[in-house]
Amino acid sequence: MPNNRYFVLYKPFGILSQFSGVEDTLKFVSDFPPEVYPVGRLDKDSEGLLLITDDKWLNHHLLNPRFGHQRTYYVQVEGTPTAQAMQQLRDGVTIKVDGKKYFTKPTIARI
C-alpha cells in the first residue's frame, strides 16, 4: 500500500491554486514535495481550504461528479441578493468559461 501524503492549506486571496507559473502560485506559499497537487481549485480572487495530495485515487473520487460529493461555499456579495437571484441559483445558471457555455447543476442557496 502506498504511503500517500496529504496537506491542508488555507489558500489566500490573490494566489492561484496551482504549482506551475511564474508568480502568485502555491509554490510561493510553501515548499511542497514535487509529486503533490491540489484536489480541485479555487480561483485567484477567492480564499479557502485546499487539500493537496499525491493520492490519485482520492483525487478522482472527490472530483468526479459520478460520486456526488457535496461542496459548501461561502460567498460575499455586494448588496442583498433578490429572491429571484436566489431562485436562479437554486435552479442552475448558465456560465461561460473560456468562451464555452455551461449550465450549472441546481444547488442549495441561502442567505
Segments predicted by a language model, with ranges:
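RNA pseudouridine synthases
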Residues: 1-111
